[in-house]
């Protein structure tokens, strides 16, 4: 059976921590920021841990991470 390939799009967007959690950046900070409050922009600049069902799907795309 051939080796599984890493999904390059998923690899660029998420990181798997040493404990196995999947971490990604929050969305909605690229453009149209003039109408968002400073608090909202600051909060969207942080990373967050994905929910368990999403994390399991991402781990299938990143078999060697």
Swiss-Prot record:
Supply the alphabetized keyword list.
Ribonucleoprotein, Ribosomal protein
- Which biological processes are named by the entry's GO terms? translation
Name one molecular function that GO assigns to this entry.
structural constituent of ribosome
Instruction: Report the PROSITE patterns cross-referenced here.
Output: RIBOSOMAL_L35
Q: Is Transmembrane helix there in the keyword field?
A: no
Record-level GO cellular component terms: cytosolic large ribosomal subunit
> InterPro entries from the entry?
Ribosomal_bL35, Ribosomal_bL35-like, Ribosomal_bL35_CS, Ribosomal_bL35_sf
Quaternary structure, per UniProt, is:
Part of the 50S ribosomal subunit.
Family named by the database record: Belongs to the bacterial ribosomal protein bL35 family.
PANTHER family reported in the protein's UniProt record: 54S RIBOSOMAL PROTEIN BL35M, LARGE RIBOSOMAL SUBUNIT PROTEIN BL35M
Name of the protein in question: Large ribosomal subunit protein bL35
Name the species this protein comes from.
Thermus thermophilus (strain ATCC 27634 / DSM 579 / HB8)
Q: Which gene encodes it?
A: rpmI
